[in-house]
Amino acid sequence: MKMTGWKKKLCRGHHLWALGCYMLLAVVALRLSLRLKCDVDSLDLESRDFQSQRCRDVLYKNLKLPAKRSINCSGITRGDQEAVVQALLDNLEVKKKRLPFTDTYYLNITRDCEQFKAQRKFIQFPLSKEELDFPIAYSMVVHEKIENFERLLRAVYAPQNIYCVHVDVKSPETFKEAVKAIISCFPNVFMASKLVPVVYASWSRVQADLNCMEDLLQSSVPWKYLLNTCGTDFPIKTNAEMVLALKMLNGKNSMESEIPSEYKKTRWKYRYEVTDRLSLTSKMKDPPPDNLPVFTGNAYFVASRAFVQHVLENPKSQRLIEWVKDTYSPDEHLWATLQRAPWMPGSVPYHPKYHISDMTAIARLVKWQGHEGDVSMGAPYAPCSGIHQRAICIYGVGDLHWILQNHHLLANKFDPRVDDNVLQCLEEYLRHKAIYGTEL
């Protein structure tokens, strides 16, 4: 009897042990299954698994950007003044402590591209089929501050998009090499085939974009729209939001285009010459070709592929391009004028009803010092919480809530040397929204 009881206990023990092992294996298999379903190398963008909360959590855990400072970004994006004040105070301390990443840092970290992309948390797969089917082209003109460039590229990067980078010929060699090292890690990012020395307010700024336009049109990527950026820009929309906004344009372009003031008209009254800087001459210019009225705007555009093709190929566009080459800051009236030219795809008539301000266009959100003031008294926006450079606000954390209320795709200017916290919070906001589709 004792032996029989012992055998029963032994059998019962083996049964419980086997059951426990089976349950453990089942849990491991379930976890492995969930992980496999969230494997970024074999994602089905339309599957329930990819859309599941569990999968999104796994993705966000792997792609969440590491916070450099303990600040309340959720509160800052909502306009919580206590969170803003704390971040501004924190920023004063950061200025004394944190130095931006150097050219050498990027030259070293990009020796192993996979490690670089993983460590810097680049999103290396499309986040939706809608984004996959609507590639965007970028013309990125840079000349300094390598960290600004890398963080901008990371923020706008998606593997289905295509990116042309133009580096100022005058930039230091170490900067050029660092840019080359970064873009060598991505098959869809390349250096412009022709580089020019960029002189402030001269034709060369336009030529840099034109060089990228030519290269991008030769790419096999079937991009739909072109956005141009500089080193102090940053997106304020996710790639998915950009795709939606561009689809809503339905082939139209979006850029500032207004009647010029008398002061602005002086920019194309006389010819300018370029050496190492732009110089005014006493030579008067002829009227613009084809009796085209000149409009004014800014350097930034959201342009359809057809618009870009006509910039480069249409004889009337080429005549206008030749005419503006010796004007002051031609990027601020060439695109604005082409946007009103009747032969340009996606343009609008030059009737006053079609004037469009920088606040109405979606290309770029900028705070101009001369327009800042009391919103309750009619000012378009409140004073800059950062500092000003050439009468333009370099944003601080106090501007972020306002920035995110606007419909623009990108904003200008940002500089981590001025306020790194606003960039950290914007990066965190965009990454969370890209993965979950919701705000912080």
UniProtKB/Swiss-Prot annotation:
GO MF term list: acetylgalactosaminyl-O-glycosyl-glycoprotein beta-1,6-N-acetylglucosaminyltransferase activity; beta-1,3-galactosyl-O-glycosyl-glycoprotein beta-1,6-N-acetylglucosaminyltransferase activity; N-acetyllactosaminide beta-1,6-N-acetylglucosaminyltransferase activity
Parts of the chain that traverse the membrane: 13-30
Post-translational modifications: N-glycosylated.
Cytoplasmic side: 1-12
Reactions listed under catalytic activity: a 3-O-[beta-D-galactosyl-(1->3)-N-acetyl-alpha-D-galactosaminyl]-L-seryl-[protein] + UDP-N-acetyl-alpha-D-glucosamine = 3-O-{beta-D-galactosyl-(1->3)-[N-acetyl-beta-D-glucosaminyl-(1->6)]-N-acetyl-alpha-D-galactosaminyl}-L-seryl-[protein] + UDP + H(+); a 3-O-[beta-D-galactosyl-(1->3)-N-acetyl-alpha-D-galactosaminyl]-L-threonyl-[protein] + UDP-N-acetyl-alpha-D-glucosamine = a 3-O-{beta-D-galactosyl-(1->3)-[N-acetyl-beta-D-glucosaminyl-(1->6)]-N-acetyl-alpha-D-galactosaminyl}-L-threonyl-[protein] + UDP + H(+); a beta-D-Gal-(1->4)-beta-D-GlcNAc-(1->3)-beta-D-Gal-(1->4)-beta-D-GlcNAc derivative + UDP-N-acetyl-alpha-D-glucosamine = a beta-D-Gal-(1->4)-beta-D-GlcNAc-(1->3)-[beta-D-GlcNAc-(1->6)]-beta-D-Gal-(1->4)-N-acetyl-beta-D-glucosaminyl derivative + UDP + H(+); 3-O-[N-acetyl-beta-D-glucosaminyl-(1->3)-N-acetyl-alpha-D-galactosaminyl]-L-seryl-[protein] + UDP-N-acetyl-alpha-D-glucosamine = 3-O-[N-acetyl-beta-D-glucosaminyl-(1->3)-[N-acetyl-beta-D-glucosaminyl-(1->6)]-N-acetyl-alpha-D-galactosaminyl]-L-seryl-[protein] + UDP + H(+)
UniProt KW keywords: Disulfide bond, Glycoprotein, Glycosyltransferase, Golgi apparatus, Membrane, Signal-anchor, Transferase, Transmembrane, Transmembrane helix
Metabolic or biological pathway: Protein modification; protein glycosylation
Keyword presence, Plastid: no
Enzyme Commission code(s) on record: 2.4.1.102, 2.4.1.148, 2.4.1.150
A Pfam family matched in the record: Branch
Side of membrane Lumenal, spans: 31-440
Subcellular location: Golgi apparatus membrane
A cellular-component GO term for this protein: Golgi membrane
Enzyme class, UniProt record, top EC level: transferase
Glycosylation sites: 108
Membrane topology per record: Single-pass type II membrane protein
Function noted in UniProt: Glycosyltransferase that can synthesize all known mucin beta 6 N-acetylglucosaminides. Mediates core 2 and core 4 O-glycan branching, 2 important steps in mucin-type biosynthesis. Also has I-branching enzyme activity by converting linear into branched poly-N-acetyllactosaminoglycans, leading to introduce the blood group I antigen during embryonic development.
Family: Belongs to the glycosyltransferase 14 family.
Protein name, as recorded: Beta-1,3-galactosyl-O-glycosyl-glycoprotein beta-1,6-N-acetylglucosaminyltransferase 3
